[in-house]
């Protein structure tokens, strides 16, 4: 096996181990899931211990093709809401290499895989999905950054703007890791 492939596999395994560590997760999960942002790391660790935040299968399977995610958590928010969090570690290979369509495909696959699960009732029971992409070696202008992509409804009618219901079931979060000394205060 080529050295580059072996190195990539080792980096990938290290990233997965780090994101499965409760001490690390309890400090970063609020970045990925804003609803958990006001909860202390100690409370997050307690949620993890109590089974409110649990790792689940990373195999995303469909009839046509399967995908393997790095780390996926099932989350039960203190308010009773439930969500799924996919965390992916990503290295840039060349400028513009991060494929937003890939991030969207992972998020949509997590939505789709809920159908047929033991918790499935109907489309109203879909959990919100967060797909967090941690850029491990971002370009200099993207370091220490968090960018969110959400679905937003807009009306194209001129005369009448109907009430547009909130469609809050999918969010892609891109985090650019950087040197803390470079972060703005």
Question: What feature does the model see in each segment?
Answer:
Residues 1-185:
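Elongated, amphipathic alpha-helical interaction scaffolds
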């Amino acid at each position: 096996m080529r050295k580059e492939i072996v190195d990539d596999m080792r980096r990938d395994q290290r990233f997965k181990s780090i994101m499965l560590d409760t001490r690390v997760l309890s400090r970063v999960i609020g970045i990925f899931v804003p609803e958990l942002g006001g909860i202390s790391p100690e409370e997050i660790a307690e949620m993890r211990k109590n089974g409110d935040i649990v790792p689940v299968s990373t195999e995303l399977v469909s009839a046509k093709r399967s995908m393997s995610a790095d780390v996926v958590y099932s989350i039960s928010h203190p308010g009773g809401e439930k969500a799924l969090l996919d965390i992916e570690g990503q290295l840039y290979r060349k400028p513009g290499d991060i494929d937003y369509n890939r991030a969207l495909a992972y998020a949509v696959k997590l939505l789709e895989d809920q159908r047929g699960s033991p918790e499935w009732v109907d489309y109203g029971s879909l959990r919100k999905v967060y797909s967090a992409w941690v850029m491990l070696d971002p370009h200099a202008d993207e370091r220490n950054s968090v960018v969110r992509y959400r679905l937003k409804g807009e009306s194209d009618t001129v005369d009448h703007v109907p009430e547009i219901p909130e469609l809050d079931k999918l969010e892609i979060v891109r985090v650019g890791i950087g040197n803390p000394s470079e972060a703005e205060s």
